[in-house]
């Protein structure tokens, strides 16, 4: 028996293949696969259930129906193996060959393969250079095509209708040949000589001028080269022989009642065979042409339906009106082969049950019901029972387990000890959704889960279910214990903060313990140790919140790393002293000597992990939880209706607001304000009233007045249960309390606009009918949103995982000096994220110098940990270059140094870590917390957005960034450049705030001047755009003719007159060509030049510009010549939340994107056309000038004669990522996407490390477009993988040849996934048909480099613990293979197996 097992093991080893290739099958290849031709459409005999001969289930072709038994029953048993029965012709062998043996159908007329015909772009059409429409007309017998023109005037491939064909026949007789149907296409394809075509097109390409024609020829050239290189022949796209799937893969099962359940494929095959046989008969009978044609067309249609039903025309339906499932449908979609069976499999040794709380468990334990454990660990139990001699055979062991003998439980305890199980909760959004625990046997039927891991699973106990999986092999147990154990997953992989932070009851309990109250029992006592304080509490001498003095002992680590004990007396409370008992040695008492809210506890755990390491943190977290639960019980905090205290001021505040609203209403009726203004003001009034009410309510709730020891009144924080819950962060928030005890406030309509009558009642008072009705809108919308959100978020995660799945850390250091420049993130002047948070856990790319010196502070390649970040802060460094995966030079992966710290472990990342998947999960997992709405900015929001000054928040020194300025007559600076920024820096040189200021800003302070907090340092007019002069002189009007190019207007209120330039459209014909401008001249009338240039100082005036000067008026530097009114920007919808993140990662172009300058140079405007203006940029160095047509309604930021830098904004709008990449480079686009994505997440309070977003961006930038091919084999304009081009260039440079140049390209994540090198990965993602068609034509081979491909072929993934296995294989492939064991063929193997089985049978 042993030999038998050994032999079976040897069999099951798969061939060690290096890759998978896909191609077109030639008719001969199909015949070589086949074991016989299927000639009849019959399936099985309905009486005997035996397969019909030569039918679709024929045993002669496909193999026997029963193991080792022929159909007629003449040969049975193993000894006749391999005999072919002379009576029924069936080979005696195993039934499983019916899963692998194929048949074939010889088609009476060739048929086009629908994939190569209809999947766009049509491969057959491209090959023949004909349109799809024409080819279809030939294939479906509507017109003829010329195959051999002979000496006639016809051309090969020309279409002829029936009439044209008959005319041509009369004219030329049989000089020429024209046919219809697939035969014609077949002959055309066969006539193509690939090599000649390639040569011709390669010669033709350089001489082509028209862009479209060049594109077309390049496409065709690529296709023909693909065919030529892969060895596929074009005529194989037309089928002459159709393969038939093995019958066990399209089963037919008899149901009771004489009916059959069958796979749709059988119906489709029957159709094909029927039509094929009929066509053969018709051809034998020499039937009339029209009948044969019709039959051929029907055959073509039936083969189309078999291969891909519904791609052409209506889908063929079965008896119950549903479309039949064709071969293509079998592999694509969520239910197809790839996603259903290859990527998602069901698992043995698993169970699921409801979860309940296990508050007494340790962090690494879970409670497993005995029943479940018994079932899951059965094989182990059987083995143990047999091993202990309690059962003689496996059967006996089985009986014992079924009877549940007492011994079984002892064995079960033994088996379970130290054997981790894995718990999983669906949906598994990130890797913390599966963790390993040690099982503890419990009574009952529910799994017990440790409360602290709920946050990671996102689990609650309202009926959630979880699945249990058992790792079987020793290796699997080892991995589960060392990598997946819940105690090893304390930090979140998304942001590196603890994920096992207490919540809810625990927080409430700890908060209650650490609160203090005035004049509590035992106040003022002093204790000589914590133990004494505890004793006082236990005996009731002092209560938990009493303010007392306690002497505590702390263990601290000094500079030398020695542990030193210190003792001191602190003012604290009894409760906090009790907390110090569970505080691990080495942490300071100050950490718990405060009100312990959720944030404080989280910080405490984080500090503990960073200072004391994993083990202490785990023990401490458990202790915190037990303590929290205990004191939450003791506190007796509960919610009663009287806890919701309504403030007395509420009613007066509401009455005041109502009065104000009435007043506005009257103003509106007397026509003083517009309807829009009234609406906005009313909303404002109610919003502020709501704020006031909630403030009054919170003041009321949060403090109470008590009598202290001296008999005086003293305010203390309230012990109101609802307030405590909200304040500690256990449950609820100020906004929710406001609805309970304040007023509900303004509600939104279903379309998102705000209803102007608010709900003034709260839940304690109760709502009346109309208020309740208004409330239902929001509630329903919320639920509908949630449902949509979940699906959308899941789909985003799927796309992200797919694009990043093959990114793995594969080397230690790529040695690049490149990196991203990190600065503190500043929004609206505030520092949102300081530099230390952005660079923590990164590697420095270039030496960082001490500010103002040449001394190296941080050497290159240092991993910045907490200590280094303190150094950065102390030396007030405000920017540094750190390594990033975006600039990593590793091919097909990244290096550890460019990635930096593994966030979930806290050290530099290991090789083989699948950072792509981690990044995708970290971004996708919080997706469900993001909103789905698009915000309309209307009313209140848009009014606030028109800023007109900068008010500083911190005192410091003023600095200007890329700003040009002139000094006006008052000595103030006027900014004359775009995209200038002001920064405020403190005395250490750290940047505190930063503001963008527009052109024409007047600064109140000079550069490097000190500013005070709250000072206004810059002003500008938000509604008009000035034109500032840079020289002093007097004005001279050119082409300014009243009534032709301008008009004079007088303001009624002020009596001042101003000149308004007319828009081109409004001018009379005489003024159409004129260009009104103001020239500045010196006193003698000579032209003035702009300082430092040879350009005369003249300013062109665009339409609608307002000039407040007269001709020949004197003017100073920095004065405004003219003002251009800005239309208030239309209220744009701001896409927020999930859709915004998806847009960024899909790199979608916004509707009206900002227009950026393509080159650096000087702006001028050319001749205008209808509705558009022509913008011309002339580069300073000479060279071609660049022109662009811009619609008139776009607000331009530039005037004639102004200089712009490449990539500067010319017309406002949302910027398109593609433009940023093209004009400002890869680092800018990376920063843009990272910051925009982070903005969305930050708004929801979700923290994600920038690294993860950068990983996805790296994958979006994988491809490039070849600009100049050099000596490489790429084509210009071709899309190629960057690493491929880099490798090819290295080889070319080594040979001293010309390398290819390329432009990086930004692809959206869906596009990038579909464009990966691996066709298996792309096909299992989306658009399966298109991907496989393209791969087959190019004869692509998949090197199985990514994770997905390896999962699909059933290997270990090349990441994590499977990384070394793949490394070894790669090394083995490089070394010549050692002497292999003699290969054994399948037939020999079966022979050996049979002999062994016979031996085994006889020895029983």
From Swiss-Prot:
* Cystine pairs: none
What is the purpose of this protein?
DNA-dependent RNA polymerase catalyzes the transcription of DNA into RNA using the four ribonucleoside triphosphates as substrates.
Q: Does this entry carry the keyword Magnesium?
A: yes
UniProt GO MF annotations = DNA binding; DNA-directed RNA polymerase activity; magnesium ion binding; zinc ion binding
Q: Which organism is it from?
A: Shewanella piezotolerans (strain WP3 / JCM 13877)
The protein's name in its UniProt record: DNA-directed RNA polymerase subunit beta'
Alphabetically sorted, this entry's keywords are: DNA-directed RNA polymerase, Magnesium, Metal-binding, Nucleotidyltransferase, Transcription, Transferase, Zinc
Catalytic reaction equation(s): RNA(n) + a ribonucleoside 5'-triphosphate = RNA(n+1) + diphosphate
The positions annotated for binding Zn(2+) 2 are 814, 888, 895, 898
GO CC, alphabetical: DNA-directed RNA polymerase complex
Q: How does it assemble?
A: The RNAP catalytic core consists of 2 alpha, 1 beta, 1 beta' and 1 omega subunit. When a sigma factor is associated with the core the holoenzyme is formed, which can initiate transcription.
Q: Where does Zn(2+) 1 bind?
A: 70, 72, 85, 88
Query: Which family does the UniProt entry place this protein in?
Result: Belongs to the RNA polymerase beta' chain family.
Source domain of life: Bacteria
Would the keyword Transferase turn up in this protein's UniProt record? yes
- Residue positions annotated to bind Mg(2+) are 460, 462, 464
Required cofactor names: Mg(2+); Zn(2+)
Q: EC annotation?
A: 2.7.7.6
Q: Cofactor note from UniProt?
A: Binds 1 Mg(2+) ion per subunit.
Whichever gene encodes this chain, its name is rpoC
Which BP terms in the Gene Ontology apply to this protein? Answer: DNA-templated transcription
């Amino acid at each position: 028996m042993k030999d038998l097992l050994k032999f079976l093991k040897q069999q099951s080893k798969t061939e060690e293949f290096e890759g998978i290739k896909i191609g077109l099958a030639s008719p001969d290849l199909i015949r070589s696969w086949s074991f016989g031709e299927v000639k009849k459409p019959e399936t099985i005999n309905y009486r005997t259930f035996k397969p019909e001969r030569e039918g679709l289930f024929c045993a002669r072709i496909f193999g026997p129906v029963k193991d080792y038994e022929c159909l007629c029953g003449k040969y049975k048993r193993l000894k006749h193996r391999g005999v072919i029965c002379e009576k029924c012709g069936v080979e005696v062998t195993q039934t499983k060959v019916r899963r692998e043996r194929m048949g074939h159908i010889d088609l009476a007329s060739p048929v086009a393969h629908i994939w190569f015909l209809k999947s766009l772009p049509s491969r057959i059409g491209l090959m023949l250079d004909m349109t799809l429409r024409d080819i279809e007309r030939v294939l479906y017998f509507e017109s003829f095509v010329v195959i051999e023109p002979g000496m006639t005037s016809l051309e090969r491939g020309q279409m002829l209708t029936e009439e044209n064909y008959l005319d041509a026949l009369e004219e030329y007789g049989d000089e020429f040949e024209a046919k219809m149907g697939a035969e014609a296409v077949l002959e055309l394809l066969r006539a193509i000589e690939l090599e000649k075509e390639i040569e011709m097109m390669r010669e033709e390409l350089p001489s082509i001028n028209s862009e479209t024609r060049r594109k077309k020829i390049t496409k065709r050239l690529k296709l023909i080269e693909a065919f030529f290189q892969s060895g596929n022949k074009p005529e194989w796209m037309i089928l002459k022989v159709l393969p038939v799937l093995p019958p066990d893969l399209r089963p037919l099962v008899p149901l009771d009642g004489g009916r059959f359940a069958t796979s749709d494929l059988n119906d489709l095959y029957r159709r094909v065979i029927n039509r094929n046989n009929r066509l053969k008969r018709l051809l034998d009978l020499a039937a009339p042409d029209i009948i044969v044609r019709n039959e051929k067309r029907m055959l073509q249609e039936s083969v189309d339906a078999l291969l891909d039903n519904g791609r052409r025309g209506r889908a063929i339906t079965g008896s119950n009106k549903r479309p039949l499932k064709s071969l293509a449908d079998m592999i694509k979609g969520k239910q197809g082969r790839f996603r259903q069976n290859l990527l998602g499999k069901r698992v043995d040794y698993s169970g699921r049950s409801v979860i309940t709380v296990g508050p007494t468990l340790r962090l690494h334990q879970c409670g497993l019901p005995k029943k479940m454990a018994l079932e899951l660990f059965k094989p182990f139990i059987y083995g143990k029972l047999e091993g202990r001699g309690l059962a003689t055979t496996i059967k006996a062991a089985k009986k014992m387990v079924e009877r549940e003998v007492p011994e079984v439980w002892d064995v079960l305890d033994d088996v379970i000890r130290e054997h981790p199980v894995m718990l999983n909760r669906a949906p598994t959004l990130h890797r913390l959704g599966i963790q390993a625990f040690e099982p503890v046997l419990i009574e009952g039927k529910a799994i017990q889960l440790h409360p602290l891991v709920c946050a990671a699973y996102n689990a609650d106990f309202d009926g959630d279910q979880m699945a249990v999986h058992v790792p079987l092999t020793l290796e699997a147990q080892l991995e589960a214990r060392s990598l997946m154990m819940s105690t090893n997953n304390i930090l979140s992989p998304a942001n590196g903060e603890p994920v096992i932070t207490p919540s809810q009851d625990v927080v409430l309990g700890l908060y209650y313990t650490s609160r203090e109250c005035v004049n509590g029992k035992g106040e003022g006592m002093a204790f000589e140790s914590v133990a004494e304080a505890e004793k006082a509490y236990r005996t009731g001498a002092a209560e938990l919140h009493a303010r007392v003095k306690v002497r505590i002992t702390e263990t601290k680590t000094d500079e030398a790393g020695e542990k030193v004990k210190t003792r001191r007396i602190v003012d604290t409370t009894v409760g906090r002293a009790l907390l110090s008992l569970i505080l691990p040695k080495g942490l300071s008492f100050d950490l718990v000597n405060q009100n312990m809210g959720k944030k404080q506890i989280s910080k405490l755990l984080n500090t503990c992990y960073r200072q004391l390491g994993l083990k202490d943190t785990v023990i401490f977290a458990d202790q915190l939880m037990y303590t929290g639960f205990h004191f939450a019980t003791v506190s007796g905090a509960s919610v009663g209706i009287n806890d919701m205290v309504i403030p007395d001021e509420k009613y007066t505040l509401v009455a005041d607001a109502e009065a104000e609203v009435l007043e506005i209403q009257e103003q509106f009726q007397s026509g003083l304000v517009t309807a829009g203004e009234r609406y906005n003001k009313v909303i404002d009034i109610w919003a502020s009233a709501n704020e006031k009410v909630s403030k009054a309510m919170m003041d009321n709730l949060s403090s109470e007045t008590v009598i202290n020891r001296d008999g005086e009144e003293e305010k203390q924080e309230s012990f109101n249960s609802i307030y405590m819950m909200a304040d500690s962060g256990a449950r609820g928030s100020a906004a929710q309390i406001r609805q309970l005890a304040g007023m509900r406030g303004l509600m939104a309509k279903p379309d998102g606009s705000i209803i102007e009558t608010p709900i003034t009642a709260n839940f304690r008072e109760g709502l009346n009918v109309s208020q309740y009705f208004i409330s239902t809108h929001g509630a329903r919308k919320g639920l509908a949103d949630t449902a949509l959100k979940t699906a959308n978020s899941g789909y985003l995660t799927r796309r992200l995982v797919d694009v990043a799945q093959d990114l793995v850390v594969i080397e230690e250091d790529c040695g690049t000096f490149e990196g991203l420049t990190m600065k503190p993130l500043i929004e609206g002047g505030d520092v949102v994220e300081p530099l230390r948070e952005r660079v923590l856990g990164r590697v420095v790319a270039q030496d960082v110098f001490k500010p103002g010196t040449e001394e190296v502070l941080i050497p290159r390649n240092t991993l910045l940990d907490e200590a280094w970040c303190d150094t950065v802060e102390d030396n007030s460094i405000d920017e540094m270059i750190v390594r990033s995966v975006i600039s990593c030079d590793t091919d097909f992966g990244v290096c550890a140094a460019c990635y930096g710290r593994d966030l979930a472990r806290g050290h530099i990342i290991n090789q083989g870590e699948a950072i792509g998947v981690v990044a995708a999960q970290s971004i996708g997992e919080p997706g469900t917390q993001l909103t789905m709405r698009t915000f309309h900015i209307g009313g209140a929001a848009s009014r606030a957005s028109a800023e007109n000054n900068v008010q500083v928040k911190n005192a410091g020194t003023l600095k200007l960034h890329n700003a040009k300025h002139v000094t006006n007559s008052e000595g103030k600076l006027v900014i004359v450049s775009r995209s200038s920024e002001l920064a405020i820096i403190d005395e250490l040189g750290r940047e505190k705030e930063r503001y963008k200021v527009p052109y024409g800003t007047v600064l109140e302070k000079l550069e490097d001047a000190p500013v005070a907090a709250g000072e206004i340092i810059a002003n500008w007019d938000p509604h008009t755009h000035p034109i500032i002069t840079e020289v002093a002189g007097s004005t001279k009007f050119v082409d300014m003719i009243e009534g032709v190019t301008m008009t004079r207007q007088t303001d009624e209120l002020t009596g001042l007159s101003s000149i308004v330039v007319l828009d081109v459209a409004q001018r009379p014909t005489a003024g159409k060509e004129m260009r009104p401008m103001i020239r500045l001249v010196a006193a003698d009338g000579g032209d003035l030049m702009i300082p430092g240039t040879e350009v005369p100082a003249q300013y062109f005036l665009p339409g609608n510009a307002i000039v407040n000067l007269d001709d020949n008026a004197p003017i100073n530097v920095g004065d405004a010549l003219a003002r251009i009114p800005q239309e208030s920007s239309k209220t744009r919808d701001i896409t927020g939340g999930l859709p915004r993140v998806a847009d960024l990662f899909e790199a979608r172009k916004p509707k009206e994107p900002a227009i950026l300058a393509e080159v650096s140079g000087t702006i001028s405007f050319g001749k205008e056309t209808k509705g558009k203006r022509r913008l011309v940029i002339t580069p300073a160095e000479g060279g071609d000038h660049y022109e662009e047509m811009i619609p008139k309604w776009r607000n331009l930021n530039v005037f004639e004669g102004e200089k712009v830098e490449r990539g500067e904004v010319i017309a406002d709008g949302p910027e398109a990522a593609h433009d940023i990449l093209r004009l400002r480079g890869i680092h800018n686009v990376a920063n843009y996407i990272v910051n925009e994505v982070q903005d969305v997440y930050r708004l929801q309070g979700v923290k994600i490390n920038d690294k993860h977003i950068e990983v996805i961006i790296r994958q979006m930038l994988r491809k490039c477009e070849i600009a100049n091919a050099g000596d490489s084999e790429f084509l210009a304009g071709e899309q190629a993988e960057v690493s491929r081009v880099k490798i090819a260039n290295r080889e070319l440079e080594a040979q001293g040849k010309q390398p290819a140049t390329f432009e990086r390209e930004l692809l959206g994540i869906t596009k990038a996934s579909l464009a990966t090198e691996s066709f298996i990965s792309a096909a299992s993602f989306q658009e399966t048909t298109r991907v496989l068609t393209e791969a087959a034509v190019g004869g692509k081979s998949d090197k199985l480099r990514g994770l997905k491909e390896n999962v699909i072929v059933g290997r270990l993934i090349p990441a994590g613990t499977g990384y070394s296995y793949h490394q070894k294989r790669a090394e083995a492939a490089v070394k010549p293979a050692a002497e292999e064991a003699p290969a054994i063929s399948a037939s020999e193997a079966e022979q050996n197996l049979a002999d062994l089985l016979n031996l085994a049978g006889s020895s029983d």
